[in-house]
């Protein structure tokens, strides 16, 4: 999805919906890549020891593909401007316990949103040309 704000800065975004994993654990990773360039973020995600880096990488690549295909932007010039993880509905499961009881288990899910935009240095150099 491509949108532009009132200040004429264009950005591309992608969403991952109903991703298995708690929003707080995904936010821990997103806080590390927010504000970084696309290539730096990919390198960081590759070497982080968290399970949530897989879905985050997938959403990040989708956002960059949206910027490249829909807006014609160079992936090397893109910066992650917004990265959020919001709570989604929990999957409810039951674990059988002793004496006919059942304990409820909530399997957390989250929605991941990532926005990328050209870095200010690349837009300044294009404006001066």
From Swiss-Prot:
Keywords for this protein: Ribonucleoprotein, Ribosomal protein, RNA-binding, rRNA-binding
Lineage top rank: taxon: Bacteria
Keyword Ribonucleoprotein found: yes
Pfam hit, one: Ribosomal_L22
An example Gene Ontology molecular-function term: rRNA binding
Cited InterPro entries: Ribosomal_uL22 (IPR001063), Ribosomal_uL22_bac/chlpt-type (IPR005727), Ribosomal_uL22_bac/org-type (IPR047867), Ribosomal_uL22_CS (IPR018260), Ribosomal_uL22_sf (IPR036394)
The keyword Zinc-finger belongs to this UniProt entry's keyword annotation: no
GO cellular component: cytosolic large ribosomal subunit
GO terms under biological process: translation
SUPFAM superfamilies (UniProt xref): Ribosomal protein L22
HAMAP family: Ribosomal_uL22_B (MF_01331_B)
Family: Belongs to the universal ribosomal protein uL22 family.
Complex formation: Part of the 50S ribosomal subunit.
Biological function: This protein binds specifically to 23S rRNA; its binding is stimulated by other ribosomal proteins, e.g. L4, L17, and L20. It is important during the early stages of 50S assembly. It makes multiple contacts with different domains of the 23S rRNA in the assembled 50S subunit and ribosome.
Protein name: Large ribosomal subunit protein uL22
Species assigned in the record: Prochlorococcus marinus (strain MIT 9211)
């Amino acid at each position: 999805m491509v949108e532009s704000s009132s200040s004429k800065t264009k950005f591309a975004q992608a969403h991952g919906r109903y991703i298995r994993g708690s929003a707080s654990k995904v936010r821990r990773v997103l806080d590390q890549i927010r504000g970084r360039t696309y290539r730096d973020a990919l390198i960081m995600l590759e070497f982080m020891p968290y399970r949530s880096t897989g879905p985050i990488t997938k959403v990040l690549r989708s956002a960059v593909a949206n910027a490249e295909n829909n807006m014609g932007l160079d992936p090397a010039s893109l910066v992650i401007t917004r990265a959020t993880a919001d709570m989604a509905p929990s999957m409810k499961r039951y674990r059988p316990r002793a004496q006919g009881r059942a304990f409820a288990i909530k399997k957390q899910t989250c929605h991941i949103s990532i926005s990328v935009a050209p870095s200010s240095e690349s837009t300044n150099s294009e404006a001066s040309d």
